[in-house]
Amino acid sequence: MVNKVYTTEIAILTAAKKIFSFKGKDGATMQEIANEAGINKALLHYYFRSKDLLFEQVFFEEVKKFSPILKNAIAQEVDLYQKINNICEAYILMAIENPFVPVFVIGELNKQPDLFIQKMFDGDLPDFPKLAFQIKQEVEAGNIKPILPQHLIMNMMSMCVFPFLMKPMFIVGMQIDKELFNNLMLQRIKEVPKFIIDSIKI
């Protein structure tokens, strides 16, 4: 019985992840999720009373895995170039493995940004001020081109996440299939930090 309950719950979470990925929380229905999971709607409501509760569990299970990886990449005592590589790799690998997460994040940030960010990181936010200070020190030492730390951080984050948010447009507009898109994203693990580092090198 316990195994059956576990199997059913996993089927629901897997189905919900797929439906939410394509339609978002507002566009998805519990009936669609039940159909995808191969169960009836009443059983779905037995496990999850509302779409909001199901959405939160699906999303935060994935985000909670990523949060410590990002925080560690930012907090590591390594040189700036290595840190840029580490952050880009963490972001892009997360998005490759969980392509729905960036879409979820944007949706929730537009609703309750402060609450969402606190919940996402359990109140322990990544140390972006430390990263900004490290960039500032490198600029002042003449090791990299003059740039506001905020611009460098935003450039890096944008280049990591934006292709995943615009995936449908890129696939249609550039006439590529999903396999090629995924291969391009894997290449960006190296391409993005190289582009960023080349832009600040003296």
Spans of model-derived segments:
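Short helix-capping/turn signature of helix-turn-helix
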Residues: 48, 107-112
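C-terminal peripheral helix-coil segments that are non-catalytic and often amphipathic
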Residues: 93, 97, 125, 129-141, ...
